[in-house]
Amino acid sequence: MIQEKKKFDAEVGKILNLMIHSLYSNKEIFMRELISNASDACDKLRYLSQSNSELVAGDSNFKITVKVDKDHRQIIIRDNGIGMNKDDLIENLGTIARSGTANFLKSLSGDSKKDNMLIGQFGVGFYSSFMVADKVTVTSRKAGEDKVHIWESDGLGEYTVSDSDKEFTRGTEIVLHIKKEEDTFLDHFRLKHIVKSYSDHIAVPIYFFDEAGNNEIQLNSASALWTRPKSEITEEQYKEFYKSLSYAIDDPWITMHNKNEGAIEFTNLLFIPSSKTFDLFHPDRKRRVKLYIKRVFISDENIDLIPSYLRFLRGVVDSEDLPLNISRESLQHNSVLEKIKNAITKRVLGELRKKKEESPEEYNKFWANFGGALKEGLCEATTNHEKLLEVCIFRSALHNKMISLDEYIANFKEGQSTIYYLSGDNPDKLLSSPQIEGLLSKKIDVLLFTDTVDDFWVNVNSKYKEHAIKSATRSDIDVEQTTSQSEEKNTDSTKSNDEYKLLTDYFKETLGELVKEVKISKKLTSSPACLAVSDAAMDIRMERFLIEQKQIANASAKNLELNPKNKIIEKIFNDLKANNKNNEELVNLIFDQACILEGEPVADTGAFSKRLNDIVQKAIL
């Protein structure tokens, strides 16, 4: 027998080290992981056998068996699924084979208490065996191949792979050599209870050997949970199915179990998690809804079954209208699949709209977890933009709570027809921004956008129900025109730029190319100045993001808006009228301050510091 000794990838070594030294209390999840893997192996072979029946010749009844050998301190899990050859064993058990495991590693903090919690939250498949075993032996024979291979490791950095001449039928057998301190898992009654807890939803029959090791007892009904009537399924069964499917420790927030019997027949059992998934925004993240055709698993990869902005969904979709022998390539642009996708999207958005109205506090928690992903749909070429906007909520600057666009519109001031927003990284900083002080002083609400995606979707969706959605950084905002014409108006704020031409020209001459235009502001009430952009220009935060991503080279010159009611600006204006033009340093300082408040870089930090020091010195001397 030829035996090869190999080292684990460094990443796998880290996971194994965590498993071996784990203090995680719910170690029984190793059975969930191994049973799920065995079920997947059977599903894969069932799918492949549709086009090649020889793969299951003589053994077409899939099953999983679990056996306890107390004398040898072993738990043995056996399946007759797809099996693995030598290369499969090395790739699947010796290296990082899935992005989820790599993402798990990135989430490790170094704090053993926190890291042990991650085990239960994310699931790490086969490697969880080493929480209870000090040695694991895997024997496997791949369907359609004759060779048998054995993989073995103690989890301490190395593993061996060898050929074997033992008699072994198709599939995989995993033998866990249980640690002395984990004796409870050798208790027949306890292990049977654990297996039954995790297996009831599994579509493959699972058999448990009695204590004598002779008779097999079937533990599960071996019928897919989603095929059963809802009236026969308990809440606990739904929860356990969700946890097994998604490797989660939380309970689902929403469960959607529906049978569609219209033009397209399909069943969906979908869940929205109650906790944020660690890899929600990872570029390699797979959508985790599995496609079945007539109870046969087809794929959960490279199929457009749900839109990417609903990638937080977990569950299964089982279609009656797709042929079992369909190729995965044919699924890429399939009209039936597209109709299923549209129906699911409509159903999910409908559930979210209902929750938003009935349980606003719960919905706020959902939004904090998944709102950023959901808003990505507003950037896509889809007919669902308005339905998506209906379920979006945003922070209200006026009321300091999350509100919908419909709530915002319902609270319009008399004469108002525009939805105003301000985008930035921190809601507290946005609340103190000069950009919105005039609007808030007139009780005109402003929505605070703090997700990066917000700056993108507003470029695609400039209106909602015929109301313009406008950034508060735009130059043409006139607070007085926005509110009721019956309100008393401050004549200073409505003076034309012509009346202050001496002032605006002086600022422009002093600042030169640093600014595009200098205007009198119709939205400032107390601050001396602010940056602004025209309606046709790119939003300030969006431009900054694209510069950071090296999509554009340089920032464009912005407009500078002045507040003639501010004492500093008033002094400069009065000096100019007295032919005193010695305020260049103060003008530059006002511009630098406007840049800082907007998150823009100061052109010359050294000069800014000197100006500030000079003004402070004049004030105290």
From Swiss-Prot:
Positions of the UniProt region annotated as Disordered: 475-496
First-listed, main subcellular location of the protein, grouped into a coarse class: cytoplasm
Region described as C: 545-621
A GO cellular component entry from the record: cytoplasm
Alphabetical list of InterPro entries matching this protein: HATPase_C_sf, Heat_shock_protein_90_CS, HSP90_C, Hsp90_fam, Hsp90_N, Ribosomal_Su5_D2-typ_SF
Highest taxon, organism lineage: Bacteria
Alphabetical UniProt keywords: ATP-binding, Chaperone, Cytoplasm, Nucleotide-binding, Stress response
Cellular compartments annotated: Cytoplasm
PANTHER family associated with the record: HEAT SHOCK PROTEIN 90 FAMILY MEMBER
HAMAP family, per the entry: HSP90 (MF_00505)
Family of this protein: Belongs to the heat shock protein 90 family.
Annotated protein name in UniProt: Chaperone protein HtpG
Gene: htpG
